Amino acid sequence: MDTKTLIASEIAKVVPELEQDAIFNLLETPKNSDMGDLAFPAFSLAKVLRKAPQMIASELAEQIDESQFEKVVAVGPYINFFLDKTKISSQVLEQVITAGSDYAQQDEGQGRNVAIDMSSPNIAKPFSIGHLRSTVIGDSLAHIFAKMGYKPVKINHLGDWGKQFGMLIVAYKKWGDEAAVQAHPIDELLKLYVRINAEAETDPTVDEEAREWFRKLEDGDKEATELWQWFRDESLLEFNRLYDQLHVTFDSYNGEAFYNDKMDEVLDLLEAKNLLVESKGAQVVNLEKYGIEHPALIKKSDGATLYITRDLAAALYRKRTYDFAKSVYVVGNEQAAHFKQLKAVLKEMGYDWSDDMTHVAFGLVTKGGAKLSTRKGNVILLEPTVAEAINRAASQIEAKNPNLADKEAVAHSVGVGAIKFYDLKTDRMNGYDFDLEAMVSFEGETGPYVQYAHARIQSILRKADFTPSATTTYSLADAESWEIIKLIQDFPRIIKRTSDNFEPSIMAKFAINLAQSFNKYYAHTRILDDNSERDNRLALCYATATVLKEALRLLGVDAPNEM
């Protein structure tokens, strides 16, 4: 039982007026540790008990069983709990040493599937930093859901269909050089894409030609289909090379084109349920009863289907295929209205499982404050950026530890980890400005800072030749170690909060706090001094390294043993 639950249960015994869960949610952490480890504000009981909060706190403090705590005292309207540091540190260290990386593993999911729609770059366009957010947030959530006992199903819903392929075919037919495209497929295709869009701004016939080629593609025209397949194959080769660098894998690459033959069923279902309404020649579903002003446009007046029709088909396919407990879409916040419509249409169709679908939105990445745009050629391409991050990491490692073995592998872990961590430490609804120098810094709230704290602990453990024993009782009671113990004890709750809120930044901030607390401990404590506390301190180091490594793993970041 964690300490918050313990305190809530003890208060509940003497306060029948409040449920234990309500008490748990009211508990606060005092700003000053001299005021205790946790505090219960008595204000919430003033109306019920018709007494002043100060009096309630004083009376309840006397009734609470103190045997589980160092002491329980009333201070004004608060009941302050001082935890038994020796007892709790012993319990926490034993749990981590016994479980290892399985510490804080939970069984909420009971093996049920979670479908995660993530990454989903557009075919024939470069994989940019803009796609990175969806990729790393989705990958981290997959690790988190697995830690909660779910089975994640990672789906790369590739953007492999649409009018842009008409544009690309027009561009390739006008200016394409087969040898150049084969040599540098994505670079050449990007140049063609930017050039044709620039021409389309002044020449309206370009759009008409593109629409015609896309119609041919939809009708299965041989030349159009072969070009489309070639663009898709070349793009996937490049994407998979990048995913390998990021250590990200997928369970499905079913993209937009996969659902081409599955949309008629959606239209038939909507028709059968009398949900389609004609509006200016188009087919729509009215969603006003869900507070959604604009109807969902299902089919345009020219008979063309839209993204939402395809996404309805995908949602049905995923439910039938995976029978998901949750289905999450890691997609930018600009698509919020689309996903509200998607859920509402499914609800109208009678599918209550639409309640299990969540749009995990996120903010934009900017560069120098400016929005990124593939169409305008204003992009930060991931491949050269990763290479530069690895080079910067290698330079710092060379300066700190020139004799390090396997420098290249460590530099890769640090460089890639730096980019991922910087993204994930940002609350996902907030955007951030891309700053590679800040990302790869070993100072501040960065991935390399956390990785270096882990490597430092491993160095201490190697120097001491220490491996903890599961049969030995370790305990500590000093203030610096107590801060670390409290964080380690909180790890299961941090995982749960990260999962419940679909918010990896909670985990990233926890990792920063734990690394900072250890570095403070390291600065104030002579860990390797040969006295009666040495093994206790080393057991704390071992537990801290175990949890730091696991926190980083849940973010999709490596934890090198040496740096």
Swiss-Prot record:
Gene3D superfamilies: Arginyl tRNA synthetase N-terminal domain (3.30.1360.70), HUPs (3.40.50.620), Isoleucyl-tRNA Synthetase, Domain 1 (1.10.730.10)
A family per Pfam: tRNA-synt_1d
InterPro entries the UniProt entry points to: Arg-tRNA-ligase, Arg-tRNA-synth_N, Arg-tRNA-synth_N_sf, ArgRS_core, DALR_anticod-bd, Rossmann-like_a/b/a_fold, tRNAsynth_Ia_anticodon-bd
A Gene Ontology cellular-component term: cytoplasm
GO MF: arginine-tRNA ligase activity; ATP binding
Gene Ontology BP, a term: arginyl-tRNA aminoacylation
Lineage top rank: taxon: Bacteria
CDD domains, A to Z: Anticodon_Ia_Arg, ArgRS_core
Reaction(s) the record says it catalyses: tRNA(Arg) + L-arginine + ATP = L-arginyl-tRNA(Arg) + AMP + diphosphate
Major location category of this protein: cytoplasm
SUPFAM superfamilies: Anticodon-binding domain of a subclass of class I aminoacyl-tRNA synthetases, Arginyl-tRNA synthetase (ArgRS), N-terminal 'additional' domain, Nucleotidylyl transferase
Entry keyword annotation includes Cell membrane: no
Location(s), subcellular: Cytoplasm
E.C. designation(s): 6.1.1.19
Keywords, alphabetical: Aminoacyl-tRNA synthetase, ATP-binding, Cytoplasm, Ligase, Nucleotide-binding, Protein biosynthesis
Family classification: Belongs to the class-I aminoacyl-tRNA synthetase family.
Subunit structure: Monomer.
PANTHER family on file: ARGININE--TRNA LIGASE, CYTOPLASMIC (PTHR11956:SF5), ARGINYL-TRNA SYNTHETASE (PTHR11956)
Protein name: Arginine--tRNA ligase
